[in-house]
Amino acid sequence: MEEFQRYFELDRYQQHDFLYPLIFQEYIYALAHDHGLNRSILLENAGYDKKSSLLIVKRLITRMYQQNHLIISANDSNQNPFLGHNKNLYSQMISEGFAVIVEIPFSLRLRSSLEGKEIVKSHNLQSIHSIFPFLEDKFLHLNYVLDILIPYPIHLEILVQTLRHWVKDASSLHLLRFFIHEYRNWNSLITPKRPSAHFSKRNQRLFLFLYNSHVCEYESIFIFLLTQSSHLRSTSSGVLLERIYFYGKLEHSVEVCAKDFKAILWLFKDPFIHYLRYQGKSILTSKGTSLLMNKWKYYLLNCWQCHFYVWSQPRRIYINQLSNHSLDFLGYLSSVRLNPSMVRSQMLENSFLIDNAIKKFDTIVPIIPMIGSLAKAKFCNVLGHPISKPVWADLSDSDIIDRFGRICRNLSHYHSGSSKKKTLYRIKYILRLSCARTLARKHKSTVRAFLKRVGSELLEEFFTEEEQVLSLTFPRAFSTSTSRGLYRRRIWYLDIICINDLANHE
């Protein structure tokens, strides 16, 4: 937010809640471009990064000033003199710039609500890896889990109505209406299995923001119920929500909902209950019984349908027992398994054999969905056999190796918390051989002949930085047995703020 303060005259705009003039400011597009630069490990936005420049931004702003009204329809570009031949580029730039603008009032309220309060502000919580040590600590003592697919609103106008409480600028709301009606693939954000490449690549930040702001409306009430029903009430229960404005909203919900929910709070008495969410999937875990989890399930369904105008079905919420269920979350399969052990006890002349089972939290990389992601990205076929990447064959050798190496390092970095590394080694093997096949295709040679001619040192980029850093951190593990010592360790990093593209199997 300090970055915004240096550029924006926020006091003047905030007095009237008037954000629309910011869309004519050049630095808005610079901030949006910096935010999206190299955000995809597959470099799908490289074309946009090369085309974007200050000159294009100036030309775009000039055209907006010259028009009596702003029309940016991708469907009738032949009749639209504003966009001309750059309709996709201009539309994407305005969409990403508008996403920066509409986040301003939420960021301001979040900052003001944090002032003077004893809420954890550690930067460690910004990493999505920070959730796994929490799960490791808590899941061993829980019984049931609700796998929840969050429903989507029945009408796009509901998204605008949600923001009307925070953005009073009618012009900004009209522009928002235009964007959400131009790209009608709203359902694809929550159900990514539907085809939505046009939607996800061009407007991801704006629609993720709209989705989070909408979900937060009923999450605020839900979090209130959780804190009221738990004996261990947390003063910072909103810290794991995707930070937009939620602290003030939660406090307001306590005042409004205290009277309304007293009658039902006794139904949800549970001292050990935890809730977490990422994008369109949320998880509710509890130490309670299956009856209690069924109460939560049907309460959520009724709350969504009766109070928030979203349609959901019971089959979108699954009740599972943690002891025999693997949790698919953030690209990992997490489970609680029993690790049996036998202890021999000697007392005087008698000896006893004691069977002891210890619960252990396991996190592994799911191999089948991972191969599916690699096959979709054209690194291998559906059976996991590496293939060449023809679209990269026109690049230089160094660029090809750099792209494959970056993907490999990012995957190793993201999946460093895996309990078993065999899956990760197989993925790295697929990427290395795919890189070799791509280079051989470019030079019109076979893989064997190409590697024999240039040497295996050409693929040294695939040795990850983590291996070098960890060799310094755990020198004994490297000196004794690297494969047995170091690579069995799970390591969670504090610089991962979003799920890896290839790890997002949904």
UniProtKB/Swiss-Prot annotation:
Q: Which InterPro entries match?
A: Domain_X, Maturase_MatK, Maturase_MatK_N
Q: Which GO terms describe its cellular component?
A: chloroplast
Query: Which of UniProt's keywords are assigned here?
Result: Chloroplast, mRNA processing, Plastid, RNA-binding, tRNA processing
**GO MF terms, alphabetically ordered:** RNA binding
Query: GO biological process annotations for this chain's record?
Result: mRNA processing; RNA splicing; tRNA processing
Q: Does the keyword Cell membrane apply?
A: no
Q: TM segments? A: none
Q: List localization entries.
A: Plastid, Chloroplast
Q: List the disulfide bonds.
A: none
Tell me one Pfam family matched here: MatK_N
Superkingdom, according to UniProt?
Answer: Eukaryota
Q: Does the keyword ATP-binding apply?
A: no
Please report which protein family the annotation says this sequence is part of: Belongs to the intron maturase 2 family. MatK subfamily.
What is its biological role? Answer: Usually encoded in the trnK tRNA gene intron. Probably assists in splicing its own and other chloroplast group II introns.
The protein's matches in PANTHER family, at most eight in alphabetical order, are given as: MATURASE K
The protein depicted here goes by the name Maturase K
